[in-house]
Amino acid sequence: VIESIEAFAVQALCVADELGFPEDKVNPNGGAIARGHPVGATGAILTTKCLHELQRINGKYGLVTMCIGGGQGIAAIYEARQDL
């Protein structure tokens, strides 16, 4: 599952295409353009969406990308544990 920030939609689409992300794995339940979220809530919202989708599909890894202002960005990779 890949939850990618869409603050700049064209950039997000180009990066996903360049990195070869499968379309069905990127923002599977709609991204920021489709659903929206308040400024400052990106990390919490995208991480929660990613973790819920991993649970729903019994997935193993999730990638979350976020913009953090000033032209900077951050990413986090999560691994769902099946042994809990």
What function would you assign to each model-found segment?
Residues 1-84:
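Claisen-condensing/thiolase-fold acyl-transfer catalytic domains that form or cleave C-C bonds
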